[in-house]
Amino acid sequence: MEMRRKDRILGEEEILEILNKSEYGILSTIGIDNSPYGVPMNFVYEDGVIYFHCAKAIGYKVSNIIYNSNACFTVVNDICLQPEIFSIKYSSAIIFGKVSIVEDEAEKKKALEAIVKKLSPENIEAGMKYIDNNKSKVYVLKMEVTEMTGKGKK
């Protein structure tokens, strides 16, 4: 669908900046009963895909992904309410794609390391040790990006 407010469209470089500086976003999936399900998740954008991690359990998120791999991921940054003029400043990205569970152990480890480097750069060594001790307890989810859109108001 085409964006209505063309004056607020952000380019790919701005979208990537949003993804790289954001700590979390909302991953939205579709359930077996066709109900939407959105869950906040931290993530990393690496090599053109988005990686997430979660407990190695079959809850709503994972069962939805197994049922239907189509998903949407939304990130919002730089929010500044302007109550006196009934407006808001923001930058946002909406990513569409297909999500799967990463089965390859090398890719899984690489994704977890990228998440640690992004979200805990001051604890890299401890993070790598934590990954080695706990990677069997988590799923890494991979979103193959099919479309990215960005919108903002400065």
For every predicted segment, state its role.
Residues 12, 58-59:
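Structural motif corresponding to alpha-helix initiation and N-cap regions
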Residues 1-21:
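Extreme N-terminal tail/first-helix region
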Residues 7, 16, 60-62, 73:
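Anion-coordinating catalytic cores for phosphoryl-, nucleotidyl-, and glycosidic chemistry
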Residues 55-56, 67-80, 89-99:
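Active-site-adjacent structural patch at catalytic or cofactor/ligand-binding sites
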Residues 22-57, 73-74:
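Short beta-strand segments
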